[in-house]
Every structure is written in structure tokens, then in C-alpha cells.
Amino acid sequence: MFPQKITLWLYPLGLFANLFFGTAFCVQWSLTRKKGYSVVPKIFWYLSGTGAVFMICHGFIQSQYPIALLHSFNLIIYFRNLNIASLNPLPVSKIASLLVSVATAITVSFAIGTRYLPHMTWMASPNILHLNLPEASLSWQLIGCIGLTIFSLRFFIQWFYLEYKNQSALPAPFWKASLLGGSICLLYFLRTGDLVNVLCYGCGLFPSLANLRIASREAFRKPFSNSCFISAGEHSGDTLGGNLLKEMHAKYPDIHCFGVGGPQMRAQNFHALFAMEKFQVSGFWEVLLALPKLWYRYQLLYRNILKTNPRTVICIDFPDFHFLLIKKLRSRGYKGKIVHYVCPSIWAWRPSRKTVLEKYLDLLLLILPFEQNLFKDSALRTVYLGHPLSETIKSFSPNLNWKDQLHLPTDKPFIAAFPGSRRSDILRNLTIQVQAFQASSLASTHHLLVSSANPEYDHLILEVLQQNRCLHSHIVPSQFRYELMRECDFALAKCGTIVLETALNLTPTIVTCQLRPLDTFLAKYIFNIILPAYSLPNIILGRTIFPEFIGGKKDFQYEDVAAALNILKTSQAQEKQKDSCRDVYQAINESASSMKECLSLIFETAS
């Protein structure tokens, strides 16, 4: 098409094109190697498309019809990979029409050029190094065309996977066609001394070989073991996990269950790699100081999962840690089913976590009724189970002699205090609860019974009681908390799952949660967690049934809680709360699926 001097001067355009191709495949290979399976990011298509434009120009300038034609086809397929993920993807028929139109336009252009332009041919062989090579015979040109055809078929293979298998990926047949076609093309261009194409097809063999090696690893990957990894990081998660394991062992006794769990899970023939208690930290500084140990345990966990390759991974609540684990497993090529039990509080803060759930999970188990609306338009499969505490509390048989066993006085009625399970919870929340009790009119008419979630911290409870001179007080072990809820006049409870338990036990409750200054600052001004209600019963019904005192020292004082105690001591206020608690129970149990149905969905359906 152009005089020889201009053709030689523009020859580096092909090298420039190959720079884009090489960068695209380097990015693809880097991500594939990191994740352990074939990955094709969007930047791959943009870089390849840019390279294709330069290569089409190179084909016209160097009078190489097959190069211009095949890279035009590839350019359209690159475009299709980006277009199909857009809001307005074109139909397949239009893409096919575009391919035919481009093929016609390029063929006609070369036909006209070869007829009327003296320097243009259908398949020139630029010898930029001026090697003493004889002109390629018809047989060699035929070999070159066969190689180019096979090499370009790879993107038609990719297009097939894209349209009919809905996979914007580079499958093993793509790399096989690349390797075979690229090898033939390399021989041809070595024969003709075409430096650009020698570099193009020679370097192109490396990503083909590397990706085929990964594909072969995938083919011989260790099959799934008949096991299930389950992880819970908090007491509430341990309760859920214990109930889940009980149902699992009854329905699937041969499945080996291992992971992270507390006492209730460990009591269900569960192999704990780590005790749940080793992951329990709260508050900014506690989490910061515990990060090295948490990171070490996280590393051991995901490596153990990849080594064991369980059929299913079930993460219970504890979202920040579990999201990190789930992302790592997927990035390292874990193909099993991943289930998250308990939806993170995306309705309260960090709604972007919904995208993470949709991207990495196969199934999300919901326990709160209002969460169903959050995913009604989502592709993520969800199952609403209802809150398991509802059934637990409904079937609970109280110990009628619990007060005698604990040698509790019976001369006065009592108020219950549930300060929380962590050391920091006890030091902050119990102090407020005790001070409020002491400042109220109930101090002279009632005993204060403090529920202890962790016997290790009983001495802290005693210290707080003694420091505030709360003489009419006693400690009640957590195993008697439901008896305590049912027989107390009303309760003071730290915001959390315990508040839902008091509601389901029809216990009138005042909610307290005193935060440290740093936690208050982060919640208000960094994470912007400002809600009309924070305790689950209030959120479920969409109205305030339990008074809430939540925040830092400037947000409320113990005198405010004491005033609420004086109001709640009236029988009318207590009955009003109990009626609302019955509404909570009804809302939780409407349209809930059974655990047996859920387990069938997890273990008897494909991912």
C-alpha cells in the first residue's frame, strides 16, 4: 500500500502493538498466578483492544491481509466482552453482523488495493533485518495461513464460552489453540524473517504454557472431602452453631465438622481447630492490639481449609473476620459452597458489604424478618430461618429450684442486670446499671441479680457491686439466665442478642450500652452509625418498645436510666412492654423455613 521506505519506517508500529498485547497477558498471568485459577480483568480487554487497533493498521501498512482481518475479528470480540457486562448489551445477532461487515470491508479494501496500488499484496513478508532468505513458497504461505487461522480461532472459542456459558474467561481450549496456532505461526515468521511477528508469537507461547499448567492443576485438584468447615467467633454464634451441628449430625451423620467454635459447638462432636474464645475482642484498642494473633490464626485457618478442601464452608456471624477469610478462600481457588449464617447489619452501617455477600457467597441464611426485603432484588440466594432463639426459648423448661440452688433470698422481688460477656462490657455497662439501680426507688424494695456470662469475670462483677455499695445484690450464672428473665420484675440489659432473649421471654427491659469516647467518636463521626433504634426488638417492630440508653458519657447519665426504672416499675408500663414482646415473637416466626429444609439446600444442591 505504501512505498517501501515508508513501510519500513512504520514497521515499529507492530512492535508498539505487541507491547499492549504483552502487557495485557502479563496482567492476566499475574492475577491468575495469584488467585490460582484463570482470571480475566477488564483491563485485559482494553489493552488487547488498543493493541488490536495498532495491529490492524500494521496489517494494512505491511500488506498482510490475514493479520488485518484476524485482529479485526479479535477487536470485535474484545469489545463484546466489555459490552456484555454493560447495562445495554447488544444481541448476538448484531455482533455476528458486525463480524461479517468487518470481514467484507477489509477483504474489499485489500482487493481494491492489490488491483490499483503497486506496492500492495495480500500477504507480504517484510524482511526488516535484510536476511538472505528466499521468498516464501506457496506451501509456506499456506502453513502461515493455517497457523494464523488456528491462532485466531482461540478468541472465537472464548466468544462461544462468553455467549453460551456466560463466562468472560479464557478456558483451556483457548490456550490450546493459542499454543498450537502460535507455534505454527512462529515457524512461518522465522522462515520469512518478520521480526514483529516472531516476537509476537514467540512471546505468546509463554502465557499459553503457563495457563495450561494452571488448568492441568485444576483438572487434578484434590476432590472435595466429606467435611464441613464451620466458624463462629461470638457467644451468639456459638449458640447458632450448636443448634446447626445438632441438626446436621441427625441428618448427615457422616459429615466431619471442624473449624472454630465455643462450648456449645464443641459439645456436638465438633473438631475445634481453635476455641472461639481466642477470637473474642471488642473496642478499637483491643482489636488493634490483638491483630497480630488474629492474623496468625486467620493464616492457619485458610491454609487448613485449602488443604482439607471441605465441600462446604459455613461462617456464622462475626462478619469482618469471616469476610476476610471468604475472600481469601475464593482468591486461592476454593470452589466449594460458601454459606454465611446471619446477615451482617448492612441496614445499620457499611451497606457496601451487600456487594461482598453477592460476589462471594452461594447462600445467605437470614434470622431477622426485615432482612428479607434487603435482598428481594438480589441474585444472591437467601433463606429466612427465623431466629433460633425463638424456638429455644419456646421449648425451654425452667429449673423451678434455681433460687434454692443458688441460695438466693426470697424476701424481696428482684431486678435483673445483663452487663455483657466481655471484660470491658462489665466494667462500663454494669457500673451504669448498678448506679441506676442504686439511684432509683427500687434500691430499697428489690434485690439486684447480675447475670454472669463468663465465670472468669465474676470477681469484676463483685468489685463493681462493692465499689457502688450495692448490698442487696447477687451473681447468677448464665445457665439460669432464662429463669432470671422470667421471674424478675424487669431487666437492665446491654444492647445485643441478650435484649432479644429478654423480649422472647416477655421480660420488660431497659437497654443500656455505654461506649468509650473513641468508640463513640468512631460510631458517630467516622462510620456515621445513627439509627432510630439499636436493639433488635425495637428494629423488628419499627417502634420503641424498650427504652434505649446508648452512647458515651455525654449522651446519657445513670440518673436517666434510674428515671426509666421508676417509670417501668408500674404494672401498666410492664404489661405494655409484654404485649409488644408477643408481637416480636410473632414477627420472627412468620414465613420462616425449617433448619432441615435449609440443610437439604446446602448439602443436596449444586453450588
From Swiss-Prot:
Q: Which InterPro entries does this entry report, sorted A to Z? A: Glyco_trans_19, Lipid_A_biosynth_N
- Is Lipid metabolism set as a keyword in this record? yes
| Region Unknown, annotated ranges | 1-224
Single GO term (MF): lipid-A-disaccharide synthase activity
Gene Ontology annotations of biological process type: lipid A biosynthetic process
| Reaction(s) catalysed by this chain's protein | a lipid X + a UDP-2-N,3-O-bis[(3R)-3-hydroxyacyl]-alpha-D-glucosamine = a lipid A disaccharide + UDP + H(+)
Q: In which pathway does it act?
A: Bacterial outer membrane biogenesis; LPS lipid A biosynthesis
Name the segments for region: Lipid-A-disaccharide synthase: 225-607
- What keywords appear on the UniProt entry? Glycosyltransferase, Lipid A biosynthesis, Lipid biosynthesis, Lipid metabolism, Transferase
Please name the Pfam families in this protein's record.
Answer: LAB_N, LpxB
A GO CC term? membrane
Please state the Enzyme Commission number of this protein. 2.4.1.182
Give the top-rank taxon of the lineage listed in the UniProt record for this protein.
Bacteria
The record's top EC class is transferase
Q: Spell out the family assignment given in the record's similarity comment.
A: In the C-terminal section; belongs to the LpxB family.
Question: NCBIfam families annotated for this entry?
Answer: lpxB (TIGR00215), PRK01021.1 (NF002173)
Summarizing the function annotation, the protein's role is: Condensation of UDP-2,3-diacylglucosamine and 2,3-diacylglucosamine-1-phosphate to form lipid A disaccharide, a precursor of lipid A, a phosphorylated glycolipid that anchors the lipopolysaccharide to the outer membrane of the cell.
> What name does the UniProt record give this protein?
Lipid-A-disaccharide synthase
Q: Which organism is it from?
A: Chlamydia trachomatis serovar D (strain ATCC VR-885 / DSM 19411 / UW-3/Cx)
